[in-house]
Structures are given as structure tokens and as C-alpha cells.
Amino acid sequence: MDVEISTEFIKLDALLKFAALVGTGGEAKYVIAEGLVEVNGEVCTMRGKKLHTGDTVTFAGQTVKITR
């Protein structure tokens, strides 16, 4: 699935909520801290990681690509 952003970047925890992959910010924080989220194919535990156009995020079998 593609997620279009209108800003230069979106933070990882915000993307998970925006794409409806998690229900709350607390849930986003938990799944990121547990190493359940991949950014560009690598596990990422930084919830404030800035994602830019072209980045991909995978969680729970779903992949999201950032577009602009």
C-alpha cells in the first residue's frame, strides 16, 4: 500500500497510526520497541525515525511505501 505525505518526512510512529497499522500511539511505541517493524528491510527500534519518499515500512505482513 502507498501512503502519500505532503511534508518532507513523517516519523515512524506517526506513519503506523496514519496508515492504520496500529490503533494508538502506545501500540506504535510498543511494536517498534519490540523490534516488530522493519524500515527498508531492516528492523528499526527508533520510533522517531524520519521516513522520506521511497522508504518502505513492513509490519504484521503489510508493507507501506511512502510517496509524495
Language model features by range: what are they?
Residues 7-50:
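A basic, amphipathic helix-loop patch mediating RNA/tRNA/ribosome contacts
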Residues 1-2, 68:
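Absolute protein N-terminus
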Residues 61-66:
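Short, charged beta-turn/beta-strand-edge "cap" motif at the junction between a beta-strand
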